[in-house]
Each structure stands twice: as C-alpha cells, then as structure tokens.
C-alpha cells in the first residue's frame, strides 16, 4: 500500500530544480526571472495565455491573478485561467501571486492553489517554488491526488486498492515506469472511461524516485 513509501529507505531525496519546467504568466515584468534561472530553475515567462494547450509541457504553472486570461473574457482573470488549467491538468502544481489583498470571491477558483505575495524576496521565491516541486514529485502526494480524482469518478474501493498496490510496486521495483499502468489485468476490470482517466493522469508525471 501507499504506506510502504513511508519507510526510512524511501525518504524522498531533494528534487533537481532543472528537471521541472515552470511557466510564469504575468502581463508585467517579472522582477526575479533571471535570478531564479541562475538559482537553477527552468522558467519561461508568458505575457498571457492564448489557450490552455500551450502549457501542456509545464508541470508547474505560476500565474498572476490580475491582467491575464484576457482571451477567456472572464472577470476573474488569472483565477479563472488557473481553474481551467486545473480542470485540464489536475496533477500539475499551481501557484497564484498577487498584491497584499485580493477579492475573496475568487477563493473558490483557487482551491488547492498556493498563494504567493508579490512583494516577497528572492529567497522566499526559491522556497515557494521548491515546495511546488516537492508537491508534484513526491510519489505519495501524487497518488493521493490521483486517488481523489478517481473517487470523484466513482471508482470502487477494491479497484482503487488494486491500482494503489500496482502504483506502489512501480515506484519501489520499476523505477517509476508507468508505461504499462494500469496493467492489462487491471485494465480488464476498469470501465474504459476510467482507464482513460488513469492513463491520462500518469502520462505527464515526473516522480522523484530512488
């Protein structure tokens, strides 16, 4: 089970920053862009989002709340953009950054999203992004996200337990290779729509395995 990933020998090592592509969406200059690159982060800045697909290859997305998402014509701006990205790419890590205050009405758009204040210094930016990397590279955290999604798809608990065991086996014994997940045996017990959901979820994950 997922508890097998908690043993001392399975302590997660520090993830390499340059393994994780990061997109920053901001219509203004991002002050610490070059400094973060010098600190080892692989970051590209976009002034806005033309569509959701342009962020397909980025496991981490950091978005300003104001001034972006114009093509989507939502008064919620960046918050709406983040919500739509989360629907399409639920296993990515998201952060929204803004000034000292923001309209609390957007809280429903930012469930599970890290909030970063614009006025923090470079040291704090490094900490925030390292936390985002940890969030998407820890195998246990990734499984818990997958499990929540599958529960919402009404996958039965027996199938979930079987998938969890197979997931853990891949982490412990197959170096995180998810090309055959779920296995042919498991596939036959899953609804085709659910199988497609599982395969789409694991397609883009980058786990920090030993």
Task: Name these PLM-found stretches.
Residues 144-210:
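C-terminal output/effector regions of signal-responsive regulators
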Residues 24-27, 46, 61, 85:
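Conserved sequence signature across two-component system core domains
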Residues 36-57:
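A short, well-structured beta->alpha microelement
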Residues 58-89:
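Conserved phosphotransfer microenvironments
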Residues 121-156:
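Receiver (REC) domain switch/output surface
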Residues 28-32, 49, 65-73, 100-104, ...:
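Short acidic, S/G/P-rich loop/turn micro-motifs used as interaction or catalytic elements
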Residues 80-108, 115:
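A short, hydrophobic beta-strand element within the central beta-sheet of small alpha/beta folds
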Residues 12-29, 36:
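Conserved acidic segment of CheY-like receiver
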């Amino acid at each position: 089970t997922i508890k097998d990933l908690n043993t001392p020998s399975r302590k997660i090592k520090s993830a390499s920053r340059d393994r994780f592509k990061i997109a920053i969406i901001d219509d203004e200059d991002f002050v610490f862009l070059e400094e973060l690159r010098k600190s080892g982060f692989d970051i590209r800045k976009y002034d806005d989002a033309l569509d959701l697909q342009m962020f397909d290859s980025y496991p981490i997305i950091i978005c300003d709340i104001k001034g972006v998402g114009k093509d989507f014509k939502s008064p919620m701006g960046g918050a709406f953009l983040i919500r739509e990205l989360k629907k399409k790419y639920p296993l990515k890590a998201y952060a929204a950054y803004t000034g000292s205050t923001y309209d609390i009405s957007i809280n429903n758009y930012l469930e599970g999203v890290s909030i970063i204040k614009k006025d923090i210094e470079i040291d704090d930016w490094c900490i925030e992004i390292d936390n985002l990397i940890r969030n998407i590279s820890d195998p246990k955290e990734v499984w818990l996200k997958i499990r929540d999604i599958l529960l919402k798809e009404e996958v039965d608990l027996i199938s979930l337990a079987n998938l969890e065991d197979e997931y853990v086996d891949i982490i412990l014994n197959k170096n995180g290779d998810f090309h055959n997940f779920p296995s042919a045996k498991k596939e036959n017990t899953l609804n085709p729509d659910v199988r497609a959901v599982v395969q789409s979820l694991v397609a883009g994950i980058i786990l920090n395995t030993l």
